[in-house]
Amino acid sequence: MATQTDKQTIGRHLEQVPKASNLISWSRNGFIAYIPPIITTTTTTPTTTTTTNNNKSNLLLTYIKNSDGKKWQLASPEPINIKLENNFLPQLSLVSWGSLNTDLAVSDIYGNFYILLAGVGLLDPNHIPSTITTTSTIKTEGNTEKNKDTKQIGNGSGTNGHGDSPINTPSFELTSYNHMEMIYRDIINPDINVAVNPGASIVAFKWLNIEKPQIVNKAATRLAENPTTTSSNSSSSIYGYGINQYQPYGVCHPIPTKQACVALRKNGQFILFYQGEHKVEYHKICCNLTDNISIIEKASIGFNNDKQIIVTAWDSLSNDINVYSIDINWGFLVESAKRQKLDQHYHTPKEAQKPPRLTLKKLHQMKPIQCFKEEDGESQSQSVVPEMGKLKVEELSSIDIISSNPDPKSGLSILITYGSSIIYRYALEKSDSSNTTSGGETSKNPISQAFYNLGVEKKIDWKGDDSSVRLVFKDKLMRRGQIESIINGFLDLSSLIIYKDGTVDVVDTTSKQIVNNSKNNNSVTGDEMELDNNDYPPKLISNLFDQGFQFPKISHKNRLVLAISPTMSSIVYTEIYGETVNLQLKPLERIDNFGTNSHDLYYTSVAFAHRYAFALYTSTCSDDLLLLIQSEINRIKDAVDGDTITRNKLGKQLCDSVIIECHKAINFHLDTITKESLDKLLSNNASLQKLLSLQLILGEFQQSSHFPNNYVVPDIAWIVLNLRSASLGIMFTLSSIYRQVSKKKPSEDTLQDSITRGECIMSIIGNFKWLIDLLVYLNQELLQLIYVKNNFLNNGNTTTSKLTLSNSIVLPLILNKVSRLFLMYAISAMGRTHEILKKLHKDLTEANKLFAPMKESLNRYFSISNNSPITVNLFESYLRECDALLNKEVPQKILTANNSINGNVNGNSGTSTNKPYSALKFEQKLLIKGIDVNDDNDSSTKISNTIIEELSNMILDRYSISISRETKLSELMFYDTDWLNIGINKKEVPSYTIDALRKLIISDSSTSTSLAKGEKLRVCTRCRAVSLVGDVTGLWTMVFQRTCMCGNAWVNV
């Protein structure tokens, strides 16, 4: 009976959660945490009806994954269970990802609060997170300040509530984001046999902002309508891109790498949970909004421009809506933040650790207004006297705060909703004696006007409080739909109104305009939020809605649990009392601007590029955006009349345009890359990484039997990504070895030194093998292309060779500047490492200190190096010759092409400064499209093909002179490079599993089921690369502990 009662209690409390948006949270890392809906089974007998709760987990985690290169889907949900004593799974009521996307806040119906940390593993599984709290508050009401004694509550471990001491401090290791550990618990009600205490439940929650600048891209702006200035998009309008850099705003933890959050319980207790100056543990301080007994039914938390926390709460006992401001004095953390900018390991002495404090002030109090609505759903103005029988009184349904955003002109808005459809918007404004309210009170005078006038007659001048703030009514918004919840968007630049029928309005918080749903039935009544969508192409493209996309319609029977992706490209949803715990995933749908000509494709690509740039600047996962791009490509193919080849060409045209616009949107110019800037691309530049991963996925999606050469595009992206990671690994390892040998003489080497250095060398063995085999494959292609060329010149006929100019990989890799520089850099790094290891081997042998670990690792390295069928130094010299040749020839040929075009247009070749063709277009053609002589969509592509063909013949002739005569043809052509899985002989399903990071075969099965005991795999959610979990501290693979080479997240499997 007790169990059945508890299940009924759980179901009732889940239904009573005021906002279904509290039950799901989508992080910018791409992980979706959600509280599963109640899955019930009803059993009926002649005498009773029994309902059974079938939930086995109370918290689930999922993410979007690339299943086969062409399809995206949600992964099977993984249980992240929150347990109380005796392994009891309480019903959860709140889940929210933090601002840094690694901390997950969770609360249950008993009021217990938990924080989980994603991407870490607990080294001591038996460690239980403790709760250490400090309470310190100053309450201020009006001009009276009441100080309370500081009270410290704790378990004796730590000082001033801070667990920076080694006592009871857990140790973590970094791992994939789908692995989580609980790092904090605030247990209010551990006894599950006690009835739920309604006063302990959390009714409002918010994460604090991060104390660091944020870059966000501006809206794409239409620049011109001049055909002579257009790019390869063949459009008469081109768009320009820019960025905004916002300074930290709102309320932030003073240390940029730390987080804090605030919560309000139903009994009026306000709590600040915050991290200390080091480590990940949380602490808390709290205060009560009032000394009286209160039951807060509806509340919201936000931040204003003065770095204050604003709380608006409705007390059901007094029927008052109260507004409070809360200031945080961060204590010693402010000074620590300054010191850590100079010394990141700075620790504040314990005697100087003054804990944070809260200062509370009541700003305003009012009663809910009487709000009326016509029975048929039409709104009624508050000034109109209601007619009984036609109007009904709407009750207070929700309170929401839209925080001020980084724009200094923005302000905090308090939204009070009645009847789930009528929104009254208020703002907090400082007092001004010149402004009077409709009730006859001045903003600066809280007493009635009559008493104020009496004071003037008595010559008593009351000047008021210059710092006083009043709640000012701004406007009323009428909605035809029933509002489920209102949530803040990224950086509070927008807010989302989610309706009970599943539709969503996106509201710009600065202009107060709805940027989507211009034709939706839920549109605002009146003209408060009108948006002109008749301008096409639009002057500004700031989101996908500007190009005719809209959130999909959802058919459902029960209450929806819905979340919108951070890129606003798709939604996920489920139903309470649904048939499954799995979420449903839907991308945006196109409802307008269905054109498929080259202009329309370009405008669409601008919208996609703007969103992709937003994801890159804000470190947001964009997998859902790729899903939308692929669905749009499929829509275009289905909408066009014609054969399959025509449809696929149109899809490829959009694909290429999206990639090119993404380069432009983040201001990444392939033609400006130099040898000097290559180090930045290797170490800390995510732009190239993200652009290549986009090219990899879209290129893989475009592969079909109608375009057999389409493998070239993803292969080029994959090779350059691997060249980047391999070069980074080699240089990192080379630096580590150099530091080790510079500290000690070879005669002082120990066994531990040998083990450490041996591990460094072994970590790059696979990448050495991959690089050498890649060079071998490139030489194989070059030899075949020379054969094809000579056969055509000598015999005048075509060859039966599968390899041609169009499907070659080696030619675009050498002709393109970026890939050529990466090749040269990787070969140079190999050469330097080879020389150091040769010297090290010699010195250790002479000193009789060549221990077994070093001996084994060096033998494996030299075995790979010595068995190569090519001479690496010779090929490096060839690449340098090609580099010098291309740096000279490419500008000359581009100049000739432009002169030729200008001569054709103007009648002479020297009078125009018009440059329709550029080095950028040439480099983009090679890296993004490869060499496709059949690609002739526009004049720019035809010029590229002509130049590429001429330059290809040059580098093939140079290869014939420099290398081919000194190459052992039989050894080279029969050398096995199939495991690289690139080029014309690529296997769709390899017969083994390769660690993509370390370039080692880890399983003789493509299903990865025959791993060694104790080994675990991680998989990339985007490119599907696999790698072994576990990175030795100090090795280069630590750089990729959480993210793949393509920049997306790993997930442990």
Curated annotation (Swiss-Prot):
Residue stretches of biased makeup (Basic and acidic residues): 142-151
Location(s) in or outside the cell: Nucleus
One cellular component term from this protein's GO annotations in UniProt: mediator complex
Chain residue ranges for the region called Disordered: 139-170
GO biological process: positive regulation of DNA-templated transcription
Keywords: Activator, Nucleus, Transcription, Transcription regulation
InterPro entries xrefs: Mediator_Med16 (IPR048338), Mediator_Med16_C (IPR048339), Mediator_Med16_N (IPR021665)
Similarity remark: Belongs to the Mediator complex subunit 16 family.
PANTHER family listed in its UniProt record: MEDIATOR OF RNA POLYMERASE II TRANSCRIPTION SUBUNIT 16, THYROID HORMONE RECEPTOR-ASSOCIATED PROTEIN-RELATED
Protein name per Swiss-Prot or TrEMBL: Mediator of RNA polymerase II transcription subunit 16
Lineage: Eukaryota, Fungi, Dikarya, Ascomycota, Saccharomycotina
Gene that produces this protein: SIN4
